[in-house]
Amino acid sequence: MKKSSKTNWINMNEVSGFLLYSAYFAWKRKIEGTLLPHDLTHVQFILLMTLGFLKKDKAYVSQNDLAKFLCFDVTMTSQVLRALEKRGLLKRSQKEGDERSKFSELTDAGLAKIQGAAKDLLKAEESFFVSLGENKQGFDEHLRGILQQ
């Protein structure tokens, strides 16, 4: 890592963490702009999509299941799910005998909402990562490797 000779500062364009941070926020701006017409935040979209994904293999998906899978704070997850429930995009219930756990399920309106938003999101993702070209698969592999550390 080079330091500027005049200031003895680290060149931020050579710091991987800073580059990742900057790229993440550029990507996030694009995704949030894409989801805005669907009246969803990125966190809301991710929770709805993940709920649908996890529901394929489980009869019940709890708030804790969602939070753990996404590495989200449980309290924040509960607050966002409550807001989505008020909008009619999911319903929450309790399994008999387990009053502490809340289980969520997409409503038809929630499923329709994420299906429409997902199409636009995938187009935005493709547009954002187009500069990777043939390297996208390798890039994704590197990201998965980082996440497994």
Question: For each of these PLM feature ranges, what is it?
Answer:
Residues 3, 82-141:
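Charged, amphipathic alpha-helical coiled-coil/dimerization segments
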Residues 1-38, 87:
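N-terminal leader segment of winged-helix/HTH proteins
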Residues 63, 81-82:
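Short, hydrophobic-biased segments on the C-terminal half of alpha helices
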